[in-house]
Amino acid sequence: MDQETIDTDYDVIVLGTGITECILSGLLSVDGKKVLHIDKQDHYGGEAASVTLSQLYEKFKQNPISKEERESKFGKDRDWNVDLIPKFLMANGELTNILIHTDVTRYVDFKQVSGSYVFKQGKIYKVPANEIEAISSPLMGIFEKRRMKKFLEWISSYKEDDLSTHQGLDLDKNTMDEVYYKFGLGNSTKEFIGHAMALWTNDDYLQQPARPSFERILLYCQSVARYGKSPYLYPMYGLGELPQGFARLSAIYGGTYMLDTPIDEVLYKKDTGKFEGVKTKLGTFKAPLVIADPTYFPEKCKSTGQRVIRAICILNHPVPNTSNADSLQIIIPQSQLGRKSDIYVAIVSDAHNVCSKGHYLAIISTIIETDKPHIELEPAFKLLGPIEEKFMGIAELFEPREDGSKDNIYLSRSYDASSHFESMTDDVKDIYFRVTGHPLVLKQRQEQEKQ
């Protein structure tokens, strides 16, 4: 990029091209803000990039195999787009809404994930996608199925302003455990509703007011209803397409991008100590505020106390007992293994253009609870059958120490162990509110803007 042509003054500087940062730069550009977006790395995605097989070996293996051996086993490098952080989109979730409203769906194609499964007593079972599937599900006995059907009917017919639909329950006063009790649901049903539908990672939610759980279960049911089969969507060519889609949105609205540009120095105003700009090899750039991922300001972040282990597994066969599904999610609830946190397994395949023909990618993640984290993943490995290659990494989770108002430095959170993007979009909305002073209201792009 020719230094002569680059402006030096902006409304916002964004550091890092993770999905959180790219959504925010896209939204702020649409709002008319002049955005400069910089990444020290030479590719989009930050911690949540999609990488080729050779990059994967480079990142995780001490002694990578030769190119010849790799290609004879796994095919061409260009056929691989492997997510470093596994997540699916809820079909009716907030990220999908943002994609549709900003029209980023023009740049990214999606495919439905074939199924959602839950682990129970050593086997995996399909999570019922609706009342009809609940009736035929082997997860429950005949009387429990009726109770489950009534529970799902209550969820779908509940109206806030119609007390007759409330069944005597107050979502803000009754706990979720009391809701389950009202419908007479047993422990194993509570487990798969709470973990495979509401997608809670532990059981703390049982003693909390029911509303957040109600909303999560409703989101799950509405997401399933949108396309059938499962509530999840996944982008063709991997999750790395999402930051790039929002980067294109930002560029259409005048955003400037610089990859492979390390930050040499952060500048602060002498009198107030607030953010003033950054120095790079391409020059000095100024803006009244910055949005960044935690790696740019480690001193302004603190550990959440949690570490996540993720294992990327290459298979040359579908996962056993899943009807040869080309993609699925398996949730292993914590109580099944005597753990505090669930284990998630996300499986995609060549149907999504993320690996060479005949291969499958299974990515396992959980919050570490012992000093032997790789052993914690053993139950998930067993479900996959023979594994051709395995890459394992551990990430500490960080969050900002302050809200950014003092120094105008607004930091995103690390990507958690959850299997979907809802917590990430909460972070987007939270940062957007702190930066602009008003809540994010999604507006459809104007037709003339789409040209």
UniProtKB/Swiss-Prot annotation:
Gene Ontology CC: cytosol
Keywords: Cytoplasm, GTPase activation, Protein transport, Transport
One Pfam short name: GDI
GO biological process, one term: protein transport
Localization in the cell: Cytoplasm
Keyword Transport: yes
Annotated InterPro entries: FAD/NAD-bd_sf, GDP_dissociation_inhibitor, RabGDI
Main location: cytoplasm
Cysteine pairs bridged by disulfides in the record: none
GO MF: GTPase activator activity; Rab GDP-dissociation inhibitor activity
Signal peptide residue numbers: none
Stretches that traverse the bilayer: none
Stretches the record annotates as Interaction with YPT1: 106-112, 234-259
Function field: Regulates the GDP/GTP exchange reaction of SEC4 by inhibiting the dissociation of GDP from it, and the subsequent binding of GTP to SEC4. Plays an essential role in the yeast secretory pathway. Extracts GDP-bound YPT7 from vacuolar membranes, antagonizing vacuolar membrane fusion.
Similarity remark: Belongs to the Rab GDI family.
Subunit structure: Interacts with the GDP-bound form of Rab GTPase YPT1. Interacts with YPT10.
Note: Present with 7280 molecules/cell in log phase SD medium.
Protein name (Swiss-Prot/TrEMBL): Rab GDP-dissociation inhibitor
Organism for this UniProt entry: Saccharomyces cerevisiae (strain ATCC 204508 / S288c) (Baker's yeast)
Top-level taxonomy: Eukaryota, Fungi, Dikarya, Ascomycota, Saccharomycotina
Gene from which this protein is expressed: GDI1
